Amino acid sequence: LAGPGGAGKTRLSIEVGLQVVEHWPDGVWFVDLAPLSEGEVVPMAIAGAVGAPSVPGNDAISDVVAHLAAHSALLVLANCEHLVEPISRLVGVLRERCSRLGVLATSRVPLGLIGEKLYRLDPLGADGVESDAVRLFMERSGLDGDVDLSDVVGLCRAIDGLPLAIELAATRSH
């Protein structure tokens, strides 16, 4: 999933994981990579999240591959944009060696993998009072129909229809 920050990629990836978990016998693992600043720690973060045992003499990539190769599961990697190159390399290895593993990655930019299926998540439309952005604002704000919806449309346009920004603005509207 690729799209601008605040478009809802992480939230959507969590929802996808919840919806498809029954199709993956060994479940779904979620790894948020946002806190990482170095590409070298990506395999260790994934190993910790999936419970890959550390084998003496192995590096973290080998531990992750050995563990995930034995599972039919979905690995969700969120917030990959700041470490695209190391994540792409690791996902490439996982795709080669872990035939029963699915990978769903979220990023502001595509990972650039051969065979990557790219789904773009764009901001919500804010083109009128019936738009998705206005509906989200009204739903999250709890305001009733007495609000001047043209102001809400203007606000939603000003924040580019980004769901996260709309939700934050809605919570401050009281």
Predicted regions and their residues:
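Aliphatic-rich helical/repeat scaffold segments used for oligomerization and domain docking
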Residues: 1-174
